[in-house]
């Protein structure tokens, strides 16, 4: 399509959140409003990998992945991590693994306390959670779950009657043996074991640009934005009036510009536009529009340890690769049944907080209902060099509420050069204590309980110099393993946070006519997996924008 010279609204970023936001906004404002989505990557629709589960693995590192590189990270043995993020229409919805998991009520309520705005509480967001999903499992509580939203959501057991993984019941029993009780999925309480929910529709991925109706929106792909243009009038805050593309073209916005470029690109674009830490911006010869020190700060992610376990008597057909699990039903989503969320015991948490110099618990982690670690068992090894022959399973032990914080800043004044990313993973005593505890709990479930020992033989060493972990392994053994091979779930967030960079209406502080709507707005981490929250936030953001227009029109 030809890029228009002027529109009402420009959305920078046609990713997971940007497409949902555009769709909601077009429906709220009607056909009289012109909305333009600018996406740096291509339209992936013709690529079959963009709609299949396995395709998500194939797309990692491809031309549809930003593949950001971090700086060497001292807290994890100076390793450089490649961060996957979708570089295409649909963004990371073309390559994520489909987990549909809200955070705990207490996670969102912590936001509310930080922001003094109940719209960001769990109950405040619940209408938008429900509005985004079509979850029609038998017996679903209509007060918690939506049934008519654009995103079809299924439980494992509800996706196909033939999709009955043989490890489902043994794992349920193993976790129960160590005191983990089953709780409803996505109903505001994470603590316990719940069935995994996913947004694969009969085995087909639902990228946001296909799940959401964009018929009332203009979309331009392969359109990288260089900066936001501002109008500066004496005694007034600068107003965002348009964008400059990397190829030199300019587009004006009559009403608002919304940045939805993700936790890396959104703060980078603000800094390129002169909004951010003045010292960083001026270093690259960019005029400072507004000194906002928090832009690019507060970076966090769900850091995790991934492991492989060897099964006992694999001829029983317990994981993928065995001929008994060849039915297409077993490939309709992630081969997993349960997610387990637990808290670090209070005495260990208190000790770690004190070690971090935070005895008053500024993160609010000691709330009785909060959980700190999520564990999953996947019936596929998912590891290089490990055969998919029915003999192995993979596991993830993931920090849900990390206290480690990183940052990012411009590497240059060019939009084509990625920013300098310093994640600072696993750098606090709390994060170390939580992950070590989570790994021990998993070892206990799989190698100590009777139900676990019946199916699992042992944890596998990931390579030379690293011994297998057992319940007898020391905390240092586990910590060394995490430092050696731990990696994030690519749930980056926090770099344009509500309360510091943004007000609670998602407006960029210090300027007019500019908002941010994506994972960078998270003021603090959430449990669960972010996409369920992001689709809700897109709906809320569209409501805020449309209400602002109505208020202005009324005046």
Region roles according to the model:
Residues 24-36, 41-46, 228-237, 242-334, ...:
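Glycine-rich loop(s) and the adjacent beta-strand/alpha-helix scaffold that form part
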Residues 524-540:
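A conserved FAD-binding loop/helix module that cradles the flavin
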Residues 221-229, 236, 374-378, 390, ...:
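A glycine-rich dinucleotide-binding beta-alpha-beta segment and adjacent secondary-structure elements
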Residues 2-131, 289-294, 301-311, 329-330, ...:
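N-terminal glycine-rich phosphate/pyrophosphate-binding loop and immediately adjacent elements
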Residues 32-33, 277-389, 400, 429, ...:
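Mid-to-C-terminal "cap/lid" subdomains and adjacent gly/pro-rich loops that border
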Residues 113-231, 237-240, 306-310:
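Conserved redox-cofactor binding core of oxidoreductases
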Residues 285-286, 440-447, 538-551:
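Internal hydrophobic alpha-helix adjacent to the cofactor/substrate pocket in enzyme cavities
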Residues 380-383, 391-455:
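C-terminal segments that line or cap access tunnels to active or ligand-binding sites in enzymes
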């Amino acid at each position: 399509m030809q890029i228009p010279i002027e529109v009402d609204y420009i959305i920078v970023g046609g990713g997971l959140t940007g497409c949902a936001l555009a769709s909601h906004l077009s429906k709220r404002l009607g056909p009289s409003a012109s909305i333009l989505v600018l996406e740096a990557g291509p339209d992936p629709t013709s690529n079959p990998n963009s709609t299949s589960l396995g395709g998500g693995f194939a797309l990692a590192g491809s031309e549809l992945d930003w593949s950001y590189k971090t700086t060497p990270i001292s807290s994890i043995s100076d390793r450089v991590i490649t961060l996957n993020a979708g570089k295409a229409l649909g963004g990371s919805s073309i390559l994520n693994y489909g987990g549909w998991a809200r955070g705990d009520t207490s996670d969102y309520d912590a936001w509310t306390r930080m922001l003094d705005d109940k719209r960001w509480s769990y109950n405040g967001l619940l209408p938008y959670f429900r509005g985004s999903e079509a979850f029609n499992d038998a017996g679903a509580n209509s007060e918690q779950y939506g049934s008519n939203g654009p995103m079809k959501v299924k439980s494992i057991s509800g996706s196909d009657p033939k999709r009955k993984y043989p490890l489902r019941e043994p794992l349920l029993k193993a976790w129960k043996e160590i005191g983990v009780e089953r709780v409803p999925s996505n109903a505001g309480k994470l603590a316990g074991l719940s069935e995994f929910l996913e947004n694969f529709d009969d085995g087909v991925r639902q990228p946001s640009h296909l799940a959401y109706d964009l018929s009332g929106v203009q979309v331009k792909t392969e359109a990288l934005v260089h900066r936001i243009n501002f109008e500066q009038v004496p005694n007034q805050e600068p107003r965002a009036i348009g964008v400059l593309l990397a190829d030199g073209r300019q587009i004006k916005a009559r009403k608002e510009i919304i940045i939805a470029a993700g936790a890396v690109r959104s703060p980078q674009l603000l800094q390129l536009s002169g909004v951010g830490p003045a010292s960083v911006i001026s270093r690259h010869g960019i005029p400072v529009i507004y000194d906002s020190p928090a832009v690019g700060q507060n970076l966090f992610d769900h850091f995790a340890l991934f492991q492989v376990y060897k099964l006992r008597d694999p001829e029983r057909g317990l994981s993928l690769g065995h001929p008994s699990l060849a039915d297409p039903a077993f490939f309709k989503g992630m081969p997993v049944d349960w997610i387990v969320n637990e808290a670090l015991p209070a005495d260990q948490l208190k000790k770690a907080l004190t070690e971090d110099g935070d005895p008053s618990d500024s993160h609010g982690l000691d709330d009785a209902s909060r959980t700190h670690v999520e564990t999953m068992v996947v019936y596929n090894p998912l590891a290089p060099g490990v055969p998919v022959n029915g003999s192995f399973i993979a596991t993830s032990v993931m920090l849900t509420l990390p206290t480690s914080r990183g940052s990012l800043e411009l590497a240059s004044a060019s939009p084509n050069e990625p920013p300098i990313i310093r994640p600072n993973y696993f750098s606090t005593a709390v994060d170390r204590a939580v992950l070590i505890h989570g790994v021990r709990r998993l070892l206990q479930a799989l190698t100590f309980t009777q139900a676990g020992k019946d199916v699992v033989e042992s944890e596998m060493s990931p390579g030379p110099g690293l011994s297998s972990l057992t319940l007898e392994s020391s905390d240092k053994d586990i910590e060394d393993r995490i430092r050696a091979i731990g990696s994030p779930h690519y749930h980056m967030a926090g770099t344009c946070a509500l309360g510091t960079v943004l007000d609670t209406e998602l407006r960029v502080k210090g300027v007019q006519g500019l908002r941010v709507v994506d994972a960078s707005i998270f003021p603090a981490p959430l449990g669960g997996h972010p996409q369920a929250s992001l689709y809700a936030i897109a709906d809320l953001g569209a409501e805020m924008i449309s209400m602002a227009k109505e208020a202005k029109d009324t005046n």
